[in-house]
Design a protein with these regions (language model features):
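Glycan-recognition and catalytic cores of secretory/periplasmic carbohydrate-active enzymes
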Residues: 1-151
Length: 151
């Protein structure tokens, strides 16, 4: 039904064309003004589902809403460029929190482990970034496996 689509789509429509720091979506936005209220970007708590649902919503619409895929791709490329880190000396790949102004919090919330599966879902389209997404998905999955195995 169109009525439900319009209600569910309203928050996404608000974000289309909105200026985002480095192509990433901060954790909080004002419901009154639509302005970002923090510079923090995370793949962990309070943000994990947003990124996941971009690609899932695109798939659920039969891939007929290209802006959803575009938002997903832009965010994933920005995440890879600005948030993905490698630990030393173990060499595990993790997704740090972006705190704004080029600053990272070098930790990975366990909820960010979903990012591996999310990237794998996003790589099933024959798109331009499939190989990059799968490589990163595998690395994040390995990190999360080891994180749980070792604790």
């Amino acid at each position: 039904r169109r009525r439900y689509w319009d209600v569910a789509e309203a928050p996404i429509r608000l974000l289309i064309g909105k200026s985002t720091p480095l192509g990433l979506y901060p954790t909080f936005i004002s419901p009154r003004t639509g302005a970002w209220t923090t510079a923090k970007v995370t793949m962990g708590a309070l943000s994990d589902s947003f990124y996941e649902y971009l690609v899932k919503q695109w798939l659920l619409t039969g891939r007929r809403e290209p802006y959803l895929r575009q938002m997903f791709d832009e965010a994933m490329l920005a995440m890879a460029r600005h948030m993905v880190q490698r630990s030393s000396p173990s060499g595990f790949v993790y997704v740090a929190d972006y705190m704004g102004h080029g600053q990272l919090a070098h930790k990975m919330d366990h909820l960010a482990c979903f990012a591996g599966a999310m990237l794998a879902v996003g790589a099933q389209d024959g798109g331009s970034y499939d190989a990059e997404y799968m490589t990163l998905a595998d690395a994040i999955g390995e990190t999360c496996y080891e994180m749980y195995r070792r604790t």
